Amino acid sequence: MLKTKIYVTALLSFAFKIMFAQSVIQVSHFDKVIVSPHIEVTFIEGNEEKVIIENSTVSEDKINIKVNGKTLRIYLDDAKEVDKTETINENGNKVKRPVYTGTVVSATVIYKTLEELSVRGEETFVCKSVLKGEKFRLKIYGESEVYLNEVSLEELRTTIYGESNLVIKAGSVKEQKYIAYGESTVNSLAINNNTTKITVYGESNFQLNVSDEIKLTAYGEASVEYKGNPTITKGLHFGEIKINKID
């Protein structure tokens, strides 16, 4: 009897996951995406715009997928901007706990065009397709891991708040601009780049491959390792700056 109950429970759990794996939400046109905490997303270019829920530990009615203007927002109830807490009784004491912990939803976003991406939380985000165009804006909040598999851009503007990690794996960007608040890490050694402008508030590390010029302004501690033969231009800086060429 016990084995039967365990089997049924496992079967129901599996069926629950399969149901979400088959959950596809068609959406209207967008070119900007905002992802809130506890949601892990992979971005893929395609012929139709939709969101696929690959896996979830909450019921579907708690997952919000909305397009306003040309902005797609994906968020959970009680975690649109930041985590909310709930009060529970624990051994006779009232204790506040976050509504969600860890990654709750894994999703895939299929887009036609993507010009701006804003992510929040501690999840992993992967742009699998080539990001191409005149300008791409990236905003990272929290302790996220962001991977851009390939880029072909005239300009990449990135703002990082927190202790996040950005890796760009291949391609080219004519002009990079970074503003970093906190202890972020950026690795774009694998791409071709003409100029990079960096403004740091805190402690950030950059690994770059630049041909023409690196401009650096730092209010804190900044570390820059680079390949290429760019001119190094230092603006205002308070704190320790380390700039090293990689052979």
Language-model segments: residues:
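Bacterial Sec-dependent N-terminal signal peptides
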Residues: 1-28
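Acidic (Asp/Glu) and glycine-rich low-complexity loops/linkers
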Residues: 22-120, 124-139, 150-157, 169, ...
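Short, surface-exposed interaction patches in beta-rich subdomains
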Residues: 166-247
